[in-house]
Amino acid sequence: MIVKFPNQPPELDYGNREYKRLLKLCNRKSFESKATQMLYRIYEGNGHALYLVGIDANGRVTRIKYPELTETIECLREISRIIDATIKKINIYRVDDTSYVSTLRITKEI
């Protein structure tokens, strides 16, 4: 089913929300940088972070193809493993015939 996923407010430098247009499988150094960022968002949310995939930093829905979405989710899984965090819930929204956005709830005991 196609849903209307609204644009979001611009991403803030603080808080537990992180927007990602997409992530490509990348090297260890890049993973470590993203892991530090994820840990920061989790701490800002007292153990909980919300990642929105397919959303630019300005909050606009960018609509990514399904293979890019699954690659981004897999990158986030690997990053969460690095910091011993858990992806608790993944929601995938089809926003048109070929494009998607996703939300991921990530938690860690702090």
Predicted segments with their positions:
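Polybasic/polar functional segments that serve as interface/processing modules
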Residues: 1-110
